[in-house]
Design a protein with these regions (language model features):
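A structural signal for conserved, well-ordered secondary-structure elements
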Residues: 1-311
């Protein structure tokens, strides 16, 4: 099996085998554009994203040292103590620890829910804590993230243009990055994954990975097309396609190397420790790394070829 994969990689590098990324550029870019449009429409059709309490605001309770960590017990206790409570979410965030989130409660309702959770899980009063999270905190995080995203894109455009000495690679790289972030967020909206500050951090981190993957491919393209004007053995499109195929195995291997530890963290965070910061961050990274690789291969490289082939 290993020898077969090694031979496959050698065949791609030598050009004996290849995938027609450049020849299929129109279809690939059209499909990518369709995915972006759908990713934008999904939250509109579904009525928005599944936002964490940091963004929507509300009351939060944490019950520690729980013997029976059944979330249904907590949900029933909350509904009975405060029937007016909206958007009730009870989750396991660690072994023996329950977190309950809901819309903002009054002082009397907060006391009633706290007592109900204490009785339902048979814990002491000091093992139940409550807090109120205002939506302004999440709004501030979102604003800072958007500002960071804009600066990231601007700096990437300038840096790529200077490094590769062509604005067309810069624009193509940004197209791949935008595809990555928009489709990742759209997938979150489609599946209903909760968007928390940790997920936002994961989204921004994925952009760095996607950019690295794109730079590797573009470096190979620049190497293959250097001095092509004085050569007659191949066309520009053929050399771009060869470069993408030569770096294909590396891109896939890099993705796998990144996904394996992130997947392990996701498994530990979700199945063993329950919902929480670890799960939110690793889920965003897991989804984003996969989409980021596709963005490089199916968007950035074909877009650059499309911009240059018309010259």
């Amino acid at each position: 099996m290993a020898n077969a994969l090694a031979q496959f990689g050698n065949d791609l590098h030598s050009g004996r085998k290849s995938f027609g990324f450049v020849a299929l550029r129109a279809r690939l870019l059209s499909f990518a554009l369709l995915l972006v449009v759908l990713a934008v429409l999904v939250p509109v059709v579904k009525g928005g994203f599944n936002l964490g309490i940091e963004f929507r605001g509300g009351s939060e309770f944490t019950v520690s040292q729980v013997a029976n960590a059944d979330v249904a017990v907590g949900e029933k206790a909350i509904i009975e103590a405060a029937p007016e409570a909206s958007d009730v979410r009870v989750t396991n965030i660690a072994e023996g620890t329950i977190r309950a989130q809901m819309g903002q409660l009054s002082d009397d309702q907060t006391l009633a829910v706290g007592q109900a959770l204490q009785d339902a899980y048979a814990v002491k009063a000091d093992q139940v804590t409550s807090s109120f999270v205002g939506p302004t905190w999440g709004a501030g995080v979102t604003q800072q993230a958007l500002i960071g995203l804009v600066w990231f894109i601007v700096l990437v455009m300038i840096g790529m243009a200077l490094y590769f000495r062509t604005w067309k690679m810069s624009v193509s790289a940004i197209a791949g990055l935008l595809f990555t972030i928009i489709t990742t967020v759209g997938l979150y909206a489609l599946v209903g994954f909760e968007i928390t500050p940790s997920a936002i951090i994961g989204f921004l981190t994925v952009l760095s990975y996607s950019l690295y993957d794109t730079v590797v491919v573009f470096d190979k393209i620049r190497e293959n097309t250097a001095g092509l004007a004085n050569r007659y053995d191949s066309t520009f499109g053929e050399q771009v396609n060869l470069a993408v195929n030569q770096t294909l195995v590396r891109s896939i291997n890099t993705s796998i190397v990144g996904i394996l530890p992130v997947g392990s963290i996701l498994f530990i965070g979700s199945l063993l420790l329950g919902a929480g910061t670890l799960k939110d961050l690793s889920l965003a990274l897991f989804v984003g790394i996969i989409i980021g690789t596709l963005g490089t291969l199916f968007v950035a490289a074909p877009a650059y070829a499309a911009l240059r082939l018309g010259e």
